[in-house]
Amino acid sequence: MNNYGVSSIGTSLTPSPTGSIDEYTSKEVKHPEDVKVDASYEKEEVGYGELEVVPERGNLFQRWYRSFLPPEDGKPQKLKRTLTARHIQMIGIGGAIGTGVWVGSKNTLREGGAASVLICYSLVGSMVLMTVYSLGELAVAFPINGSFHTYGTRFIHPSWGFTLGWNYLASFLATYPLELITASICLQFWININSGIWITVFIALLCFVNMFGVRGYGEVEFFVSSLKVMAMVGFIICGIVIDCGGVRTDHRGYIGATIFRKNAFIHGFHGFCSVFSTAAFSYAGTEYIGIAASETKNPAKAFPKAVKQVFIRVSLFYILALFVVSLLISGRDERLTTLSATAASPFILALMDAKIRGLPHVLNAVILISVLTAANGITYTGSRTLHSMAEQGHAPKWFKYVDREGRPLLAMAFVLCFGALGYICESAQSDTVFDWLLSISNLATLFVWLSINVSYIIYRLAFKKQGKSYDEVGYHSPFGIYGACYGAFIIILVFITEFYVSIFPIGASPDAGAFFQSYLCFPVVVIVFIAHALITRQKFRKLSEIDLDTGFSKYDRLEESDKGPMTAKSLAKSVLSFCV
């Protein structure tokens, strides 16, 4: 017998936990001479004539190093399904509550006024809700890698999936360094240090977090999103107390709706259109749960609960928080224009005006964490988008590589490298550079939402055309095709209002450069789509030819009926789960 427990007569000896020689047992092996033995592995029989190579535990560094290697069996590794329902819910919340509401609200208040903000955010919120319901049904029916751009390839046109995927990825690559710069600006609220130093620290931190795979991303999002929700609820309560004159340090006393009435509409219809388009971009990130579908345990159970709860909460948080802040801060407040990005946040200004010690610092810390988690979300969604595009042949094939822990390493590294663009902030021309970088992708979220709704409509029509049973789908959007049509209609209105505001910007004369910085993405997407379609010569598929079988997750409703009738206890539990 050799040193590794494999004898020359066709047996493998497995030591007992005690290590006693008398307790060694012999197991028959079919072809031991074909077994390649390595000193770093122990051998374990899993069936007649089969050997499974199991890595020794080793020390922490050895296990960490081996996790980056390809799978031992040589087969391509797939993304791991380790996310749960609680992760999916918080990813949806975390993707939506970010700089769009904390910092971006200063622009909407200044350009449109309080009433415009409430109306536009409510209207856009209803559109996002319909879109996410459609995405939820698609994700349950087809929990495949790539989500909406994969749906675009299958249900709309392969060239559209190619165009949408690259445009969406470009938006991540352009926004990622901006999030790092914004985070460094948040720190200037306390200490003025070169931004390049902080950007280096943030990139290292994001690399560390993403080394823990999708489960690490899910846990970080769960913790941070919970913190953001508590901060949002805390501000709403605190803001109501300030408005009612309940803060001793605030000598303004009762404020009521005085500020709101004086600044309900600013710049009239022009301002309303500006807020309408800005509100749409503030909700960006709500579609992140679609990307996570391929890494979620039991999507049929996780997604219905997520789409029913998360986005109603997000809409309420947005609307209530913006209503409260509009009661306290005027859209004509000069500080919204003169102060730096985070210092000019109306949420921080509201607390500073009330002279509440400490709270502005707490809220600035929450904004800092929100910005960093936004960058973390970009790393996750950007890498998964690039990986799925490589699987479809829309990106270089080496981005398909997934290590033993289910991490798309090369795709992650590619996205993280773009954080180095954040060092451009030290240049005098940094604003111009980033404006043009964003110009080719700033409408990407609108294209994604439109694609989700159109894909859903075509999917439902194809399902009916091919005579398939709709009961096999695990989750049904409560608004169906009508909700998707409504969502698509509102998105088209946002495109129109953005076009109008780009031509006639508020407080400035029409300018060709400013227009293309705002709307260049639209012609770029159209040109890329047409060019790719002409080169590949692929045509639109008929409803009867659309593939509804690959990746389809059939749902058995008999399992649901076995749960028994609804009782008072189960009803109360469902209501409590929805509200909490």
From Swiss-Prot:
Region (Disordered): 1-30
Gene name in the database record: isp5
Organism lineage: Eukaryota, Fungi, Dikarya, Ascomycota, Taphrinomycotina
PANTHER family (alphabetical): AMINO ACID PERMEASE (PTHR43341), DIFFERENTIATION PROCESS PUTATIVE AMINO-ACID PERMEASE ISP5-RELATED (PTHR43341:SF42)
InterPro entries linked to this entry: AA-permease/SLC12A_dom, Amino_acid_permease_CS, APC_YAT
Keyword Membrane found: yes
One example of a Gene Ontology biological process annotation: amino acid transmembrane transport
Name listed for the protein in its UniProt record: Sexual differentiation process putative amino-acid permease isp5
Signal peptide: none
